[in-house]
Structures are given as structure tokens and as C-alpha cells.
Amino acid sequence: MKLYIVGPVASGKSTLARQVSQLTGIPCFHLDQVVYQKDPEKPSGNYKRPVEERDRLFHAILARDSYVLEDTGRVCFLEGMQHADRIILLDTSGILRRKRIVTRWIRQNFKLEPCDYRPNFTMLRDMFRWSRAYETGEDGTRRRALQFSEKLTVLHSPREIKNFLSSISHEQA
């Protein structure tokens, strides 16, 4: 199975990818880690990889027989949607995402949740901006996912996500 999970910041992509990976044994890849390399010396806590390195890492993942990818739907990873057997768009409510953004930011600042960036006020502001860009369609995530309607499943709520995980469990049984 080649699964691509896409959605805005704090929609639950990473959590769902890990859960699917645990249920199926298929490795999951967080594409933020393909774009960014952790670097504690940098003010942001990471740096952007050169495009050539990013693309090399991404194509190595796509060459695998199976994978679970998760990302915000960046244009540079559109090929991942093309190769996927199934695409999941997490279209959770803005209120839920904003709550998760704040909760995550607090947990990261108290070192209760790991992160590959510095959880400062700039990052908090950016997360709210990215969430809003999804809501308005400015980021193009929904539009890109809808290009693949024949293999797209849109999940809107934690209940729908739970039902999706149950269906994956039953497929594995």
C-alpha cells in the first residue's frame, strides 16, 4: 500500500500516519523531515535541505514498495499523490486545529512533546497563518488533493478518523 496523508497544520496527519504504520507495519515518512534537517545551532532549530538533496530523499521513498507519507500537500511533493494508491485529506475543523496548535506549542515549550523546530512565538504565529491559508484555499492543499478524486478519502472529524483506522485494522485481519 502507498498511502499519502495530507492536510493543514494540526489536522492530525503525523498521528494518523504513525497509527497506520503501527497497524500495518508499513513505514511512515514525515515529509517535513525530507524538507528540513534538524540543526540545534540554527535559530529556527533546523535548516532547509538543498532542493537536490530533498528530491533525492523523496524519490528514494517513492521507490519503495509501500509507504505512508504525511505532509501539508506541498507542490514539490505532488508526485507522491500521483504515485499513491490512496490519499487521505484530513479536513478537520479550524477550531480543532487552533486548539491543537496552542496545545502543541505549550507542550513543546515544556519539553513534553518533541519537535524539529524551535517552538517560539514566530512559529506559533506561522502555524495560525498556515491554518488560515488552508481555510481560505490560499495554500492550494485541498485543490491539489481533489485532482485525485478517484483515490481520495476526505476525513472531517476525529470520529471519521477513528472509523478509518478501524477499517485499516479489519483489512489487516
Predicted segment positions?
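Conserved substrate/cofactor phosphate-moiety recognition/catalytic segment
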Residues: 18, 22-65
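Short, structured coil segments at secondary-structure junctions
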Residues: 24, 83-84, 148-149
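A glycine- and Lys/Arg-enriched "phosphate-lid" helix/loop adjacent to the NTP-binding pocket
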Residues: 92-137
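NTP-dependent small-molecule kinase module
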Residues: 132-173
